[in-house]
Design a protein with these regions (language model features):
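N-terminal low-complexity, acidic/polar interaction/targeting segments
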Residues: 1-230
């Protein structure tokens, strides 16, 4: 049977691209402009090989050692280069398509850029959305649409989400998380959580809370508030 590249079964060695404010998820896309010499080399090598790069978040305090090997988080996301264009001076524009979560086992030296042996992580409590209705998906879809109605780009984001065509609950939840406004630390928490149902429950609570804040703000704007002490 043909293996699914989104369902890894073994440990692999991949190049690492650590960034301070970018958290990447499976089943999402990430455009990147590659200009640093070490990462230009990384992309060139990757295009000749497996085509995969591991995106991973830098830990706080990275600024003092950015050109070296600042500390990184343990959990990242592997992506495949699905489009690329080479620019003058060896720079690149690339598009990564997210594949799967991974855990760094240990880093491997010998290259200009960082690389590591990683453990490919499988999803826990995932659901097939093509075979039976999912109350979790329906509830998340409903409150996410309410949230998007209040955004200037909400219609465009909803079209990009393509919520009706997600085949797995993990894909659905990761796409929604990717498009929801969260601080980097919270996005990393979602990346590190392998249990899909727990991710879905947490995301539901966060979107519901944001919708409540939006409603309160609108109610306050819709009426004149008297702050007089008399």
């Amino acid at each position: 049977m043909e293996s699914d590249k989104n369902s890894p079964e073994k440990n692999i060695i991949i190049p690492l691209f650590p960034l301070p404010t970018t958290v990447f998820y499976p089943n999402t896309s990430l455009p990147l402009h590659i200009f640093e010499p070490r990462y230009r080399t990384m992309v060139a090598d990757t295009l000749k090989g497996e085509g995969k790069i591991g995106m991973i978040l830098l830990k706080p305090g990275w600024e003092s050692d950015y050109q070296g090997t600042p500390e990184i988080m343990t959990i990242g996301c592997a992506g495949e280069i699905t489009r690329h264009s080479e620019l003058p001076e060896g720079k690149y524009n690339i598009l990564l398509s997210g594949l799967y979560r991974f855990r760094v086992l240990h880093e491997i030296k010998g290259k200009l850029y960082r690389q590591a042996q990683v453990e490919c992580l499988k999803e826990i409590n995932d659901r097939d959305l093509t075979t039976e209705p999912s109350p979790t998906k329906e509830q998340l879809s409903r409150i996410m649409r309410l949230y998007l109605k209040n955004l200037p780009e909400g219609t465009k984001i909803e079209q990009a989400l393509d919520m009706g065509n997600c085949r797995k609950l993990a894909e659905f939840v990761d796409k929604l998380t990717h498009h929801f406004d969260l601080p980097v630390s919270k996005m990393q928490e979602f990346l590190e959580q392998q249990d899909v149902q727990k991710r879905a429950n947490s995301l539901y609570s966060l979107i519901e809370f944001k919708n409540q804040l939006i409603k309160i703000s609108k109610d306050m704007q819709g009426r004149e508030v008297d702050f007089s002490m008399n």
